[in-house]
Swiss-Prot record:
Belongs to the universal ribosomal protein uS12 family. InterPro entries: NA-bd_OB-fold, Ribosomal_uS12, Ribosomal_uS12_bac. This is Small ribosomal subunit protein uS12. It comes from the Bacteria. The keyword Ligase does not apply. Residues 125-144 are annotated as: Disordered. Residues 131-144 have a biased composition (Basic residues).
Length: 144
């Protein structure tokens, strides 16, 4: 335990805050060719370098669609592609947000559907906002 004099001289140092989506907190300065740590962004744009499927941890079983994305801050991350079916391939430009996938280790980001090169989920009726799906055509009203 430190003495009062030691605390006066040095003081307490607070532990560094750990971020759940660290890639969103870095920005790239192209003039100085440096990456700087900042307040963070809600989303970041990136280019897909690889699109593939992977299997989840036990006890789950599936083929989850993921993409390796090189972000505008020159970092490369693994992002999950939500929804059924997608049109992504290498060199597709995507927008990512934070948010992990609990049964996929190392996947801390989600791709936002319905923006840039990512199409929304087709024929989705409920929870459309999360999947970039447009409102379906309403049935014509019957006349009496």
């Amino acid at each position: 335990m430190p003495t009062v004099n030691q605390l006066v001289r040095k003081g307490r140092t607070s532990a560094a805050k750990k971020y759940k989506a660290p890639a969103l907190h870095y920005s790239f300065n192209s003039l100085r060719n440096k990456v700087a740590f900042g307040d963070g962004s809600p989303q970041k744009r990136g280019v897909c370098t690889q699109v593939k499927t992977t299997t989840p941890k036990k006890p789950n079983s599936a083929l989850r669609k993921i993409a390796r994305v090189r972000l505008s801050n020159h970092m490369e991350v693994t992002a999950y592609i939500p929804g059924e079916g997608h049109n992504l391939q290498e060199h597709s430009v995507v927008l990512i947000r934070g948010g992990r996938v609990p049964d996929l280790p190392g996947v801390r980001y989600h791709i936002i559907r319905g923006t840039l090169d990512t199409a929304g989920v087709a024929n989705r009726q409920q929870g459309r906002s999360r999947y970039g799906a447009k409102k379906g055509k309403a049935a014509p009203a019957k006349k009496k």
